[in-house]
Amino acid sequence: MYHIGMTQWIVGDELLEVSCKRLQQCGYDGIEFAADPYGLNAEECQIMMKKYDLNCHSLCGIFGEDRDLTDKGENGKRAVQYLKDSVDFAVKVGAELIIVVPSPVGRIIKPAGFTMEELTENAVNNIREAADYAEEKGIKLAIEAINRYETYFANTLTKAYALVKRINHKA
């Protein structure tokens, strides 16, 4: 069965109830929340989904410079913790998967001083750590290929697929 949903981030700071009401009126059956475990209230999300007969099948991960899965340092650790916290949020709202962009959205040039191999290895290790936690909770992680105007890293389906194969994880 197919589900028709909309990702919430495209409406910006619109009130959740306004978005949910519009989705129901337009015949949608789902909503994709931004993976914002620190800003969204899971209980409010549940109430709105129930009120407007919606389901949440996925969360859209938000990855910036401070959440960089290609980083071996603090930004990489922060990204892993963010994904773990997002997994907990996904469980609360009934989402089955989280969309993951391995590098910061908006960084279109590879960081100086690192090879693509080093950055890829960092991403693989960080995503595996988050995937271990996701698997325990029954949540899948999905690598999203975004275009070259938004990232230097996994910016084609071929590159994203190669990363998935290298991660080699059930989650």
Residue map of PLM features:
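N-terminal pre-domain/capping segments
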Residues: 1-95, 117, 128, 169
